[in-house]
A protein has these predicted regions:
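Binuclear metal-ion centers of metallo-dependent hydrolases, dominated by the metallo-beta-lactamase
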Residues: 161-253
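Binuclear metal-dependent hydrolase catalytic cores
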Residues: 1-154, 158, 219-253
């Protein structure tokens, strides 16, 4: 965090130096799916050497998750990029980025908007991979999570709709919001995220969207065992890790 002098913000460990939350998912049939496109996307794309994109999934309309859309031009200039969002996010796109979606300005990225409806059981495919939108709540704001094949991706969340939570059963890997150790009005705490991990029991889970209040990356797993061993079995705690920038994760399908 700018101006902060805490041990995390001044850490030299690259695991503690995080840009805004996003993910690039490569499927077995070589489709590259981007989840969210925040204002750090250009730098993230250069670091990761992203050559192509086949689809964009958007969780919600907050600045840190979508204000990099204009930087998609190199990946969506010649070939339109399918873009998936819920009704609320779609309305924001048509209003805030009307020069992309309504009155196309010359040279803008060609984003083809598809509005999905979790309440109607919408499921769609990107290549051979099935994607299921999951209704979540960021405080009071309805947002989307996604099941992408055997991967669950849930960010900025305080609740997963009871109708949709079972749709995540059977996943191999879970990436889930866990802002800090103490509770927050619009994000899961570590203990709250662990409740979801315990319900789903994936092979591996990664906490994302952490603030500097989470503490040093190197201390996380020890602290997790110390603070939550009376609430959750150690075998479950051992499957949980902090995500970090440029991390590559193998998902077993």
């Amino acid at each position: 965090m700018p101006t902060c002098q805490c041990e995390v913000c001044t850490s030299k460990d690259p695991h503690d130096n995080r840009l805004r939350c996003s993910a690039l998912i490569r499927t077995d049939d070589d489709k590259d799916i981007l989840v969210d496109c925040g204002p750090d996307f250009r730098l993230q794309a250069l670091r990761a050497d992203i050559k192509k994109l086949d689809a964009l999934l958007l969780t919600h309309n907050h600045f840190d998750h979508c204000y990099g859309l204009d930087d998609l031009r190199p990946w969506a200039y010649w070939t339109p990029l399918p873009t998936y969002a819920d009704k609320g996010m779609s309305q924001s796109l048509l209003t805030r980025w009307d020069y992309i979606f309504v009155h196309q300005y010359p040279g803008v990225p060609k984003l083809v908007l598809h509005t999905v409806h979790p309440s109607q059981g919408d499921v769609f495919k990107i290549g051979e991979t099935e994607v299921t939108p999951i209704r979540c709540y960021h405080g009071e704001l309805p947002i989307l999570g996604f099941r992408i094949g055997a991967l669950g991706y849930i960010t900025d969340c305080t609740k997963i709709h009871e109708r949709d939570l079972p749709k995540l059963k059977g996943i191999d890997t879970l990436i889930i919001d866990a802002l800090r150790w103490t509770e927050h009005p619009t994000h899961y705490s570590v203990a709250q995220a662990m409740v979801i991990v315990e319900y789903l029991k994936p092979r591996q889970s990664f906490f994302t969207h952490m603030s500097h209040d989470m503490g040093l990356h190197v201390d996380f797993e020890r602290r997790l065992s110390q603070e939550l061993s009376k609430l959750f079995p150690q075998t479950l705690l051992d499957t949980v890790h902090l995500a970090y920038d440029q991390q590559e994760i193998i998902v077993n399908c």
